[in-house]
Each structure stands twice: as C-alpha cells, then as structure tokens.
Curated annotation (Swiss-Prot):
Pfam families: EAR, NLS_NINJA_AFP, TDBD. Forms a heterodimer with AFP2. Interacts with ABI5/DPBF1, DPBF2, AREB3/DPBF3, ABF1, ABF3/DPBF5 and ABF4/AREB2. Induction: Up-regulated by abscisic acid (ABA), glucose and salt. It is found in: Nucleus. This is Ninja-family protein AFP1. The gene is AFP1. GO terms for cellular component: nucleus. It comes from Arabidopsis thaliana (Mouse-ear cress). Keywords: Nucleus. It comes from the Eukaryota. Residues 123-132, 222-232 have a biased composition (Basic and acidic residues). GO terms for biological process: abscisic acid-activated signaling pathway.
Amino acid sequence: MAEANERSKEMARSNSCVFPRDLLQRFISNSVEGEDDDEEEDDDEIELNLGLSLGGRFGVDKSNKLVRSSSVVVTMPLFREDHHHHQAAAMITTKVSTETVAGATRGTGLMRTTSLPAESEEEWRKRKEMQTLRRMAAKRRRSEKLRTGVGGGNSNNPEEAATATASRRRGRPSSGLPRWSATANKSGLLRQHSAGLDSLQVSGESLGGGRAAGSSSSVSELETKASSDEARSLPSTTQPQQETTTKPTNRLRRLSSVDMNMKMEPQGKGKSEMPCVFTKGDGPNGKRVDGILYRYGSGEEVRIMCVCHGDFLSPADFVKHAGGPHVDHPLRHIVVNTSSPSNLL
C-alpha cells in the first residue's frame, strides 16, 4: 500500500509539472460550491421591479437566457487536487471562455463549421497534374495543325517543315515570293514567274539533300531574280491598267458619237437633199448671196431659198439677185458650199 501511495504521489507531481493546476480548488471545497449554487438561485428569484421600462421592456424576463456559444473549442487538460481523496489526475475537456463552462453542463456548444471542405494535398496535386496534361495535349494539337497546314498533309521531311516555318515567320509564302507578289499571284499577274520558280525548286529537290548550302544560295538568287523581274513587270502591268481605265472613256465617246450620228442622220439626209449654195454676181453691183437648194422631185422646178430675204427663187433669178446678168445656164454659176457652218451642224 505504501508503495502504491508513493507511486501515485510521484505521478501527481509529474502531472502537476506538465499540466497547469486549478488553484481555486485548493481554497474552495465541494460544500462551498453547493452553497454558492443555492445562493445564485436565490438571487435569480429576487425581482427588483420599479415599473420602469428598459428599452421598451417592462419587468424582467424570467425565461432562460441563451447560452453564448464559442466559435473555437479547445481541449485543455487540468490537474485538480481533491483534499478528501488524493487520487491520480484525470483528463477533462473544458472550454476557453468562462461563460461556456457554465453552459456546457446545460447543453452542448455549437461547433464552428466551414463553408467549403478543406482539400487535401493529394487532390490538389491530382488536379494540377490534370491541368498540365490538358495544356500539353492542346499544345500538341496546335503544333500538329500547323505542321499539316504548312506541309499540306505530306510533311514527312523535317527539313521542309523547318524551311516552311522559317518562311512563315519571315512573313513570306512557301513559294519564296514576297508578300505583295503573293497578292499579285491571286490576280494572275505573276503566274509565269511562280511556275518557273516551282519548276526550279522541284529540280533542286530532286538533286538531293546533300547540297543544302548550294540549294539555299540558289533559292536566294531565285528570290532576287524574281523580285527584279517583278519590279520590271510592274510598269508593264500598270500600262494595261491605264489602258483599261482609258478604254471605257473611249467607248463612251464612240457611243456618244454613234448616238449623235444616229440622231443627226435625218438632218444629214436633209442637208444632202437641201445643200447650202451661193453665187457671186459679175456686174458692178455684184455680191455674194447665200441660199439653200430646196428639195425637189423629178419633173419639178428647182427652187432656191434666199437667206437674206427668205424668198424662193429660180436659179436664174438667184443669179440676178446676186447682181449678175441673164445667163443661159444659171446652175453653172451656183456653187454648193460644203464648208459653211450650217453644213457642219
């Protein structure tokens, strides 16, 4: 028995060194605690009601008040000494706040909960790995699409793919022509140059891959030749464009002239049937008189309208009107005026 008591004392000392002590238990006995509880109950029953309102409430609410719940629950081991029975320390769970110590006996406190469950490190790593795998797959697809787009589905040769990617980075098409010449190819201006370059490239590829340096130099020479030929062909191409721009105007002019001729056809017929004529008198009072040969048919007399008076005269009278003598053949003295402005109308 003595050995057991000594061992229990040693355990108590070791526990007292490790865990904090509840020092109030030394001065307060179990009987005193019971008396304090009775006094608290008596104090609760006493009401000091003066008929005043506190915040709109009259009297005292006798209902049990809500117990404040703590957001954090902590298990704290305390070693309590009992004066009546010196026994080993026991592990008890208490709450941090003093208010919750009183409410723990009446009801259990609310445990704090989180809105989202905490992820473990394994799940986080798995998710990151999946994201990296998806990104790698997307990059691989992108590179495959670029290769197939450049090589046209036949990109088995890595050198061709490399040259194609280099030309694409430089901003030039795969045919070796500049960007502006590629746009000209669409309009059909440089098809001959591109065909010649393609044939030369095919012949260079058929020679073999052992002459990489020579092929690169030949390609550069071809590019320079193509650029010079294109620069020379530019003025020649601009000339047809200018011709095409001038052609519509010429066509319009022709059409307008045709329309004018078509409109003036009846007037031309009238002029051919009624030409302008003039005559000059041989006498001292001779003068030039203009007239219009009026239309006449077979078996009718020839009449000329005088421009100065508007009278219809016979050829002999027209010659006399100009101051000439009487002649046997007056028509020989009358001249048709082809250069008069009336004929040009």
